[in-house]
Each structure stands twice: as C-alpha cells, then as structure tokens.
C-alpha cells in the first residue's frame, strides 16, 4: 500500500517550487493509504498539473486546489483549477486525441483508463464560468 497523503504532498511541493506564479492550495488528510502502482500516480499527477498549468496561462489569480480526504472507506482526491473550463460534452474530454488546446489529447483519457482499469472511479465537473474539477475515488 502507498501513502497517498505523502505522495500528494511531494507533487504539490514540487509544482509549488516550479510554478510560483500559480497559487497551489491543499488540504491533505494524513496517513491515507491506497493499493495502487506508484508509476500510475506519477502519470495522474503530472497530467493533472500539466493540464491545469496550461489552462491557467491567461487566468487572473491562477489557482489550483487539491484535497485528499477519507469518506467512509473511500479516499477522494479532488483536483480543481480556476481556468476557463469547458462547456462541451464532458465525455469528449476522456476520448483519446480530443484536446481543447495544441496537445496530444491523451492526458485525461490515459488517467481515465488507469482509474477504471483499477476499478476506481473518476468524475469531471467543468464549465466556462467555474473552472475544472476532477475527482478520483479510490475504493477501499
């Protein structure tokens, strides 16, 4: 089992150091463990941060908020940015090669595949006036 709390904090600190113009706020509960491959977490965190950083380029007061909490027996990782969001069909966002910018369009589809292949769940909430939120639910 991996200490997801500690892993979250490592990525948060790394991105805070490298992107000091973006406010990164976090609320991470301590000592929450998950059965998951560390390399998958690497893919998930790096893609989520990359997407948010690209979305926040022209946003005033760019902010990323990350939380990790335990509700019942589930761990819920929430990743939010106050970028422009997306008004189209949310299902498009997880289709391979779909992109709203000049990129491969593989990031969210890869995250979704990793999450669902491991029998976990991912929810996306977004629109053009309230940013982008992704919630990953790790079932115990």
Provide a role label for each language-model segment.
Residues 23-33:
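Conserved catalytic submotifs in the C-terminal HATPase_c
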Residues 111, 115-116:
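Detector for a conserved hydrophobic position within an alpha-helical segment of the HATPase_c
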Residues 86-97:
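Short conserved segment of the HATPase_c
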Residues 61-73:
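Short beta-strand/loop element within the Bergerat-fold HATPase_c
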Residues 41-45:
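A residue-level detector for a conserved hydrophobic packing site
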Residues 81:
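Acidic ATP/Mg2+-coordinating residue in the GHKL
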Residues 2-17:
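Short beta-to-alpha transition helix within the HATPase_c
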Residues 119-126:
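Glycine-rich ATP-binding loops of the HATPase_c
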């Amino acid at each position: 089992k991996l200490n997801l709390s500690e892993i979250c904090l490592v990525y948060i600190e790394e991105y805070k150091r490298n992107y000091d113009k973006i406010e990164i706020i976090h609320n991470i509960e301590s000592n929450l463990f998950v059965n998951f491959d560390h390399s998958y977490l690497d893919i998930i965190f790096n893609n989520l941060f990359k997407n948010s950083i690209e979305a926040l380029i022209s946003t005033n007061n760019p902010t990323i908020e990350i939380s990790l909490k335990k509700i019942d027996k589930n761990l819920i990782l929430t990743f939010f940015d106050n970028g422009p969001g997306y008004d189209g069909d949310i299902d498009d966002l997880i289709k391979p090669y779909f992109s709203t910018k000049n990129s491969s369009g593989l990031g969210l589809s890869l995250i979704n595949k990793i999450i669902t292949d491991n029998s976990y769940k991912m929810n996306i909430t977004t629109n053009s006036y309230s940013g982008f939120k992704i919630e990953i639910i790790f079932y115990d």
